Amino acid sequence: MSNTTDIKKPYPIIGLEVHVQLKTKTKAFCRCENKYGGNPNSRICPVCMGMPGMLPVFNRQVLHDSILAGHALNCKIARVTKFDRKNYMYPDLPKGYQISQYDKPICYEGYLTIENDDGTTKNIRITRAHMEEDAGKLIHLEDGTNNSYVDYNRCGAPLLETVSEPDITSPDEAVKYLKTLKEIFQYIGISDCNMEEGSLRCDANISMMIPQADGTEVNTPIAEIKNMNSFSNVKKALEYEMIRQVEEYEKTGEVNNGTNKTTRGYDDSKGVTVFQRSKEGESDYRYFPEPDLPHLEVSDEVIEQQRERLPELPAPKRKRFVAQYGITEYDALTLSASLALANYFEDVCKATKYYKKASNVVLTDICAILNAENITIEEFSIPAAHIADLVNQMGDGKISSWIGKDVFAKMMATGKTATAIVTEENLAQMDNDDEMENICRGVIDANPKSVEDYHKGKDNALKFLMGQVMKQTKGKANPVKATELLKGMLG
């Protein structure tokens, strides 16, 4: 017999709907430029504005990119797919309907594997990924007038909506899922997934499972959460909603009956979700097949062509980096976070055997520049071969890591190679043992207090003496040899 002390805590069940804007040159059903920004309503035409008599012409690249995404998400690809009209009225939708996919999505029954902090993995099932067009953007003025404007530039932009099963059981898992999905879509090159520009948008469906004393569970009404424009906001919104739903259940006892789903918006300034409306059902949208677009028959050849476009994805790349280059899992995770950075690192490794040093230079020196100047690795000025030259100078013992940082700075300033800078400025490590011994002896004689501290077992004393040696040699002392000499002289 169980008792009340055995009752489990309430837990969430979460499903995510993620819209990504595809990076095609033109929109989904017209020839307007598909690009963020520009003057309001400058990238529109009669087709994307829904003018009478205008017919859509499908952009084939949208299909190809969607199939590629399906392969990356382990989905089945439909051999026959079609478009449908999703009917609703809103100021940002000039046609009064959205061209979407209802019962025959291009991709279905897939999964995405996320990695937990403890190294275990979990598969989140993908219900479907379907093609659709974007709506415009409402701009609400904050000048006290309550006026709103509509920018239709985004109207008709191609979207891929990925819908997960409710397999996610915590806000942290939700964020891991989103980050993994974003990483994959960026790797395969179908979207830049910039949340600030709206090219990745997420809605979360959440309800709470409330265990009962008799061992059963009840399910609170589902809430769809919108207006989450960052991963941190997704986490905060879900955490708030978990508490709100449990408190609401304790007050009212209301459970999910299939008709009481609501839509709520996340208010970042207050950290709360706010009721917006009762959620529409599928029947409210009055889906019907798009009469101006034929069914699409997808051949095996097209499906295989897109499979061949699939690059090595982040998870297997990380495992290979650890095995092939002997770097840590953390470094592999950071290096593989962007395909461009991963490729740059591998280009460095093609010209050196000192893989760990290469990893250190890329992750510390180069990434510091990227962050400070807010640039990407593609915009970084030093070729990978020149970085490999710097790594080889350090790995071969020609210069110390201390001098290496100075050489890197001079490479940035002058564009010269590491070899040229080391030669021109005589920066190679000292190879005269007698000179090194004299310098070490002089440092010991000049610092009796540190010598006394060393004999008392204070670790920092040796580091201080070593620093003095490096200072006197302007970083040209071999640190291993200098340390051995100091220890031998100190006894």
Model-derived regions: residue spans:
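Strongly charged, low-complexity linkers/loops
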Residues: 377-388, 392, 401-471
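Basic, nucleic-acid-interacting segments
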Residues: 2-312, 323, 329, 350-354
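Structural motif
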Residues: 8, 326, 349-358, 396-399, ...
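Core structural elements
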Residues: 198-211, 322-346, 355-373, 385, ...
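M16/insulysin-pitrilysin zinc metalloprotease superfamily fold
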Residues: 351-352, 358, 366-381, 389-394, ...
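Amphipathic alpha-helical core segments of compact helical bundles
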Residues: 23, 209, 243, 342, ...
